[in-house]
């Protein structure tokens, strides 16, 4: 996830997107090398991207789920300006495919990332990874993805990427405790 800080950052982001499609396109996806991202990061905010679902590559989340050494995860986390965590229901496909034994692994991961953010002095932000506004719109997204030939998603896994209210997000992160949930859902999203 890349956010812009200002107009110069927007110009830098446009350049990164253009170059990713022209110079670094591969395996049906545009890519931005970290070396190029480092050159342009002055006016950007770079997040860890918590997504490790449906073939997306959230670097830190993938490392944690695959059992990488925590020191390696910590070292990689230093690259990012802030750390994202997603609702555990966003990861039901990993449980359904056997990549994780239960959603308890996601609770463990999100708690670890919260503590890691504190240790490294990085903001931890809860994001919903919303791909559509209403929960009932999941079927529309699945039709688009499956019809485009880009995915082999099982529809039953793709029902929780809707835009959640603050109350719904606080409930999703209630396992962190009331104060921590409020911090990552409300306070840190405004910093």
Model-based region annotation:
Residues 1-191:
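Phosphodiester-processing cores and adjacent nucleic acid-binding clamps
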């Amino acid at each position: 996830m890349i956010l812009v800080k200002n107009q110069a950052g927007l110009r830098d982001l446009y350049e990164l997107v253009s170059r990713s499609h022209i110079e670094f396109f591969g395996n049906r996806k545009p890519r931005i090398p970290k070396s190029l991202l480092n050159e342009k990061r002055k006016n950007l905010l770079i997040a860890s991207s918590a997504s490790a679902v449906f073939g997306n590559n959230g670097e830190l989340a993938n490392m944690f789920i695959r059992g990488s050494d925590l020191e390696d995860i910590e070292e990689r986390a230093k690259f990012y300006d802030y750390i994202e965590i997603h609702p555990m229901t966003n990861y039901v496909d990993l449980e359904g495919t056997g990549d994780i034994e239960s959603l308890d692994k996601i609770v463990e991961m999100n708690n670890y990332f919260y503590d890691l953010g504190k240790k490294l002095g990085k903001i931890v932000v809860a994001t919903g990874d919303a791909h559509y506004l209403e929960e009932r719109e999941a079927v529309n997204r699945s039709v688009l993805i499956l019809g485009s030939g880009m995915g082999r998603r099982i529809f039953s896994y793709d029902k929780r990427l809707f835009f959640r209210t603050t109350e719904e997000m606080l409930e999703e992160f209630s396992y962190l405790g009331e104060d921590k949930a409020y911090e990552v859902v409300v306070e840190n999203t405004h910093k």
